[in-house]
């Protein structure tokens, strides 16, 4: 974009030459995704359960929600009868560091996500702990919603408790993102491991 602006300035004879022509753009370093192997799912979920976080992280593993989508869930987003979660909002940090409720990243991100009956049962049990709170996963400290970064920190603690190597929270959703789902066998193994928990 900057190059185009300077090209316009050269064309209009505002400057003699485009100073960006000699610039070399740095290469964007891709971060390799790590997948939680199916054989580690049980350990991961047991560690989440010991911290009282099983419903949240079980839902994450079966739905692949983004952290901001997970924290923005309300009880009204759960359709118990049809076993779906409505994803229509997310919490993100604005430049001031404050949380803002926004639409999801893209229009296709506004969706209904099917979840297994076990996830529904865990969510109903979680709701019974705080029936008057509108948030699906309120913070036990404040009763308000979690900050999205707090979810990431909890994920790191769960990995440590389970003795598992570091995997980014974002990578938990890897098998659920259509354009990255290449290994159907691995996806089936992961689904089976979650069902067996």
Language-model-detected regions and their locations in the chain:
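DNA breakage-rejoining catalytic core of tyrosine-based enzymes
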Residues: 11-17, 27-46, 88, 95-116, ...
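Long, amphipathic, Lys/Arg-enriched alpha-helical "connector/arm" segment
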Residues: 22, 26-53, 62-65, 73, ...
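Short pre-functional
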Residues: 3-7, 54-71, 178-179
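Short, polar N-cap/turn motifs at the start of nucleic acid-interacting alpha helices
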Residues: 77-84, 184-197
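Hydrophobic recognition helices of helix-based DNA-binding modules
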Residues: 2-9, 123-127, 180, 184
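N-terminal DNA-binding recognition helix of tyrosine site-specific recombinases/integrases
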Residues: 1-21, 66
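Short, basic (Lys/Arg/His-rich) helix/loop patches that form interaction surfaces
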Residues: 42-53, 63, 113, 127-145, ...
